[in-house]
Amino acid sequence: MRVLWLCNIMLPMIAGKLGLPASCNEGWLTGLMESLQQNKEENGVEPGICFPVENIAGCSTEASAETGTGALPEDAGSVPGVRKLGHIEGMEAYGFSEDLRNPERYENALKDRLAWIVEDFKPDIVHCFGAEYAHTLAMTKVVPKEKILIGLQGLCTEIAKAYPADLPEHIQKRFLLRDVLRHDNIRLQQKKYVLRGEHETEAIKGAGHLAGRTAWDRAVSHTMNPDAEYHILNETLRRVFYEKRWQREACMPHRIFFSQGNYPLKGLHYLLWAMPDILKNYPDTEIYVAGDNVTRYASVKEKLKIGSYGKYLRDEIVKYGLEEKVHFLGRLQAEDMCDAYLKSELFVSASALENSPNSVGEAMLLGMPVVSSAVGGVESLLTHEKEGLLFKKGDTAALAEEICRLFGDCRLAEELGAAARARAFVTHDAEKNYRQLLEIYRKIES
């Protein structure tokens, strides 16, 4: 059974062999591919993988002796913008050119590039990770729908509606210099999600099979394509989160971990709005945020580059006197990310919308107390008062109340964390998820 994966990133295992920087995102893809490869003799799956590469000309297989066939010239046959990278880490790998800076744009040339890859690899099944990418739409125009499995991720049709996340109207509409130069203020970012949602809807309509994991993504995708067969497939997360465990005595008291805050949808501003109420009860509370510091500037030049959301966060931090309370950690690899969780007393997700956020799953695997907005598919991951605490999106008073509740009740926090860990080990069971994926592949092939 030949299965071609269509991914939005180059897997770290491939990047390492090519001597290229690895992405910090989508670590669960590596876990899933490792499960397939470790059981290759039993499952009979011959994997291939293709992914967008911004600088296709700079993508060479010369860094590794294991790549076998070597890279094709820039034009593969008569099709420019695609390269066969060779046999890497047990799979045939292909890179193709795509405008990664403008994911809302669809270019017809993508179809030709993917058609070349499909013709070369000859897959029985094409597994597309994410319906929201232009390359997924292009693939549905190349391969018959009965051979296509799309793994549902964020669902941009719904993200577009939630994107502004209750920010003041004038903040959504304003243009700073950076926004003017990039033609990219908050409202325009929202419009880009609208366009991606249109492509996503068309891609889902062109697929015979959909893989999801929440009641929410099942309901939303059904409205787009009621004829597609829906398969339940939970995610296998990064290995380190299965190996370590949160311990109250090892964490910093009243330290909150927030996994990402560089755009409105993630809702960091909600947590900032909640901080005055939290600080009344726990004045030593601090927030640690993974990811880029979009609020930072240390020079006039950097100040001119700050985006509208970054400036809004910075202004709110100053307004509430949080300059010494909010810390940005930068981009973290899995081990450092795990350590950031473990050093914190609780994890908060305040997103305006999520499907099944990996950050919540990772916190649950570690056995951490979790406070999350009750949005999208989150309630398919945890039950309020059982494995975590939920609050209504945007209700910052409730967010502050639930955080203070966990700070003040160590027993409750530990009970919720233990229950969260038990449930997450079922949801994110690597062996079970691998078996489920294999069953889906066999069903499609038959």
Question: What feature does the model see in each segment?
Answer:
Residues 1-80, 89-92:
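N-terminal subdomain of nucleotide-sugar transferases
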Residues 352:
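Aromatic "clamp/platform" in nucleotide-sugar-dependent glycosyltransferases that forms part
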